[in-house]
């Protein structure tokens, strides 16, 4: 029964707009145009979310030159070889849906010359640059979604049309957190094979830190050497001289003892010779008598 009622109502509405007269057709068209204009005012086409556009250096310059109005353009400079850059890419896609008023462009490092990055003041990746006709604002801060939304709101004065959560996978391939890798049981060798550029970057940072620390440590060690080592040297030399003097004294005592023994031995030998001589003289005198 409900099905027949629905069919009857649809037929009645369609019959009201049949070309029984040109006036009825004009009324239907006019009502449709009014309805469409109201819908477009509430949901203009410019607010429909669109994904970020991947461009190279030449196309980026052309789009920037063609931006004569006060429209904002957000540009993500990143490299696909770095896990930290790959982690920012999904967040940038979310931002393009939350802020459809803003044109979002993506520039990959291999698609642009180094002069393009220098022209826009990009010296590290990933970097997000907000541009309009009068200003260029580079984002400095954490790369989480809440901080990026706050940067968009403060820079452009616009509010997001919807709030979205970061529904990004946190696997080893997409998450660039070294601590997470180590926590999940990956060895240093596996990380080096998977991300050699990150290992080289860490080695470079360690070398730079060592270059900064070693001169300071060297100056401190020199100061400690100048303050304490001379006193230690004098004390060691004094003790050494005392030990050397005692050793010499012991050597002199030993020499005296040897001389004394030699003297006693000589005296004993002389006395023995004298005794033998007196005995031999006594025997010779008795024989002559």
Swiss-Prot record:
Glycan-carrying positions: 132, 184
Main location: membrane
Entry's localization field: Membrane
Membrane-related topology note: Single-pass membrane protein
Keywords assigned: Glycoprotein, Membrane, Signal, Transmembrane, Transmembrane helix
Transmembrane regions: 198-218
Domain annotation Thioredoxin: ranges: 37-157
Lineage: superkingdom: Eukaryota
Cellular component annotations (GO), alphabetically ordered: membrane
Signal peptide feature range: 1-23
InterPro entries for the chain: APRL5/7, Thioredoxin-like_sf
Protein name: 5'-adenylylsulfate reductase-like 7
Organism in which the protein naturally occurs: Arabidopsis thaliana (Mouse-ear cress)
Gene (UniProt): APRL7
